[in-house]
Amino acid sequence: VAIGALLDAVPEIKDIANVTGEQIVKIGSQDMNDQVWLTLAKKINELLKRPDIDGIVITHGTDTMEETAYFLNLTVKSDKPVVLVGAMRPSTALSADGPLNLYNAVVTAAAKESKDKGVLVAMNGLILGAQSTVKMNTVDVQTFQAPNSGALGYVLNGKVFYNQVTLKKHTTQSVFDVTHLNALPKVGIVYSYSNIEADMVTPMLSNGYKGIIHAGVGNGNIHQNIFPVLTDARQKGILVVRSSRVPTGPTTLDAEVDDAKYQFVASQELNPQKSRVLLMLALTKTTDWKQIQQYFNEY
């Protein structure tokens, strides 16, 4: 849907803020890619330098919204509010959620209380931090949640209410700068399962990958069939991050895996898809696994 049509569908927005729209790209969010992320981050940073712009709302498909939000959380260089919003139901549905979500997103972006909160996601009445937001359900309107930390706040009757802030580094505190980047390092995800074979991972060692995210079982544990491949990856200079396919809880350092011995990185609270985002940006700064572990601890 064109941005103009979205704004026309919710005329009440004009009572909250002076809103102008710009179409950056028109794709399904399942087709999101690094180039769009770089374009979006650069455009947002350019716009937020203007004194007449107080905040930005990004309409986005829900499939990869959590990844885009987290990428922007690490690359936007402003304390002005940046809010992502989408819809789980089509506009033709009996109870479409898009119009109210968009209204609440504009309310959130316009509120002075939203300043310096990091990039936000406004969905189904909740205000969520980009670092902790996860899509938890394939179809439900309450799909976006923060299972490890809870929502930052909520919107009710056109007003925002915040209950907490994130302690993770973001936006103006972030060391990552995409201003002069035209591409991101190649990082892939390996999903673990019982009886996984080495040939699922081996091709990544010779196809230009700079990093591998291992979506392990339990606390990021690694099957014996692919452990040698991942240690070989480290010998070749490919970074390896242990995350987990389990939806909640951290992947902790040196639990059942001796991370220091193998020079693996533990993803902490980040799920595999967000771990990929952080590792790509981390690799633009360094290949030192200890420094990258520090990034995962802080961001």
Task: Name these PLM-found stretches.
Residues 1-47, 228:
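ATP/NTP phosphate-donor binding region
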Residues 1-2, 64, 70-83, 98-104, ...:
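A glycine- and small-aliphatic-rich helix-loop capping segment at beta-alpha/alpha-beta transitions
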Residues 219-299:
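C-terminal non-catalytic interaction/assembly regions of soluble proteins
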Residues 50-65, 207-219:
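Short acidic, glycine-rich surface-loop motifs adjacent to enzyme active sites
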Residues 1-10, 110, 122, 239:
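N-terminal phosphate-binding or glycine-rich loops at protein starts, especially the Walker A/P-loop
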Residues 2-13, 129-211, 219, 298-299:
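Accessory alpha-helical/coil subdomains and C-terminal extensions
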Residues 58-80, 222-231:
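Short Gly/Thr/Asp-enriched flexible loops that form oxyanion-binding sites at enzyme active sites
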Residues 84-157:
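Internal gly/pro-rich beta-alpha loop/helix module
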